[in-house]
Regions:
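Active-site-proximal loop/turn and secondary-structure-junction residues that shape catalytic pockets
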Residues: 2, 31-33, 60, 221
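PLP-dependent enzyme catalytic core of the Aspartate aminotransferase-like
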Residues: 178, 206-255
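Conserved PLP-binding catalytic core of the aspartate aminotransferase-like
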Residues: 157-196
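Secondary-structure transition/capping motifs at alpha-helix termini
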Residues: 15-26, 78-80, 152-155, 239-248, ...
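Active-site core of PLP-dependent enzymes with the aminotransferase class I/II
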Residues: 1-21
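Active-site C-terminal subdomain of aminotransferase-like
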Residues: 2, 21, 26, 46-152
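Short acidic, glycine/serine/threonine-rich loops at helix termini
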Residues: 6-10, 35-40, 65-68, 83-84
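Short beta-strand
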Residues: 156-161, 204-208
Length: 255
């Protein structure tokens, strides 16, 4: 998988290989793991339950304030077995029926802020159903954006997975597959992305898809509305036309 496109690896097949070879199966679910809670989650994503450990960034698709990262481990004893140590300057009483959690025994980091509070508050406020509804809305908006891009004559839809859509400004006459035209499209879209960042009309990032420079929309904000995504294709097309015209004036674009 890759965060660039939201692609998901064949987790069930990987889990079988790990079990057969007694390997630890870790999944980087920093962005996409929360979508496993959706009723129509992809089968590969549902296989997340087979992992020995999963990394999640709640500041991404659980809408927590930056920054908040965590790891979920199937066998909690594996962490202190790996990281715990007792230097002479530590004197904690770890006995009793309910010993305190000493986080230095659970990972490399010792001193740390109370990141868990904001995640806990979000879970208490929204609950499972609330998060499912918000994530479903994000995926619905991404589908709407992908449909509009696919129907737009000047844009090329490259990928759509979960709430991530990658595409590029690509007028048909430049979609030849020739190296020089691909280079022209890359240059147009790289410049277009900088214009978007400077103008503030929409915030997109970038990815590489089959070697092509792509614009990347990742919807992970519960405040995003349909009107926001409906505006993106024409904003991109308008800026692309201006950039293409500048290229033509300079003799860059092919006829």
């Amino acid at each position: 998988g890759t965060v660039g496109t939201g692609a998901i690896d064949p987790l069930r097949e990987i889990a079988a290989i790990c079990r057969e070879n007694r390997l630890w199966f870790h999944v980087d679910g920093a962005y996409g793991a929360p979508a496993a809670a959706l009723p129509d989650a992809p089968a590969d994503l549902r296989a997340l339950s087979l992992a020995d450990s999963v990394a999640i960034d709640p500041h991404k698709w659980l809408y927590a304030p930056l920054e908040a990262g965590c790891i979920l481990v199937r066998n909690a004893a594996a962490l202190p077995d790996t990281f715990a140590y007792t230097p002479t300057y530590y004197a904690f009483d770890e006995g009793g029926e309910d010993p305190p959690a000493n986080y230095y025994a659970l990972g490399f980091q010792n001193s740390r802020g109370f990141r868990a509070l904001k995640v806990w508050m979000g879970l208490r406020q929204a609950g499972r159903e609330g998060y499912v509804r918000m994530i479903e809305d994000d995926c619905r908006l991404a589908r709407a954006l992908a449909d509009r891009i696919a129907a737009h004559g000047e844009l090329e839809l490259l990928t759509h997975s979960l709430s991530i859509v990658t595409f590029r400004y690509a007028p048909p006459r430049l979609r030849t597959g020739r190296a020089e035209d691909d280079a022209t499209l890359d240059a147009i879209n790289e410049d277009l992305l900088q214009q978007l960042k400077a103008g503030g009309e929409a915030f997109l990032s970038n990815a590489r898809v089959d070697g092509k420079f792509a614009l990347r929309a990742c919807i992970v904000n519960f405040r995003t509305e349909l009107a926001d995504v409906e505006a993106v294709p024409e904003i991109v097309a308008r800026l692309g036309r201006v950039r293409k015209g500048a290229n033509a004036a300079n003799g860059v674009s092919r006829k």
